């Protein structure tokens, strides 16, 4: 069973319209967070989120309250964040929203690490990135894709792992 822990400082980091913060230390996420260039525009997945991606420099163990303000300032209005040399963070207006954001950020990091192993990267041209950014804004104005995707993910989980929630 997994325990959902309430982050005691999430309200200091997030604006009042956000309901969920997710933070991970996955191998691919930490690997990209350790790269000076950060997330590269080399995949469709990355191109979907680059305009809403923020960075926060590593300050050591997050035990000091004064980092909260800097983290909030760096996050701004973004919903994706790479914590340099540390991991990934996403925020959302709901759990499904933050989860789907983390899914795409993590997938983007996995793709980048795999592509770098092959070498000779082919970045998405800026003109294409601009078009993707405009399309994402139009889609987001129509509502949250996460609210449609979440029930499907739960149905899949029910099929693959019945009883996970008991």
Region spans (language model):
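Single conserved hydrophobic/aromatic residue that forms the stacking wall/gate
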Residues: 1-13
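Glycine-rich flexible loops
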Residues: 10-166
């Amino acid at each position: 069973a997994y325990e959902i822990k309430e982050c005691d400082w999430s309200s200091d980091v997030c604006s009042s319209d956000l309901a969920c913060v997710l933070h991970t230390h996955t191998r691919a996420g930490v690997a990209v967070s350790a790269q000076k260039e950060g997330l590269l525009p080399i995949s469709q997945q990355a191109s979907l989120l680059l305009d809403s991606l923020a960075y926060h420099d590593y300050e050591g163990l997050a035990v000091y309250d004064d980092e909260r303000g800097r983290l909030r300032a760096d996050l701004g209005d973004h919903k994706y964040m790479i914590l340099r040399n540390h991991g990934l963070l996403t925020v959302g207006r709901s759990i499904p929203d933050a989860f789907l954001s983390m899914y795409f950020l993590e997938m983007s990091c996995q793709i980048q690490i795999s592509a770098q192993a092959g070498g000779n990267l082919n970045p998405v041209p800026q003109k294409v990135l601009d078009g993707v950014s405009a399309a994402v804004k139009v889609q987001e104005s129509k509502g949250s894709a996460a609210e449609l995707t979440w029930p499907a993910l739960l149905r899949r989980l029910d099929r693959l792992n019945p009883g996970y929630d008991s």
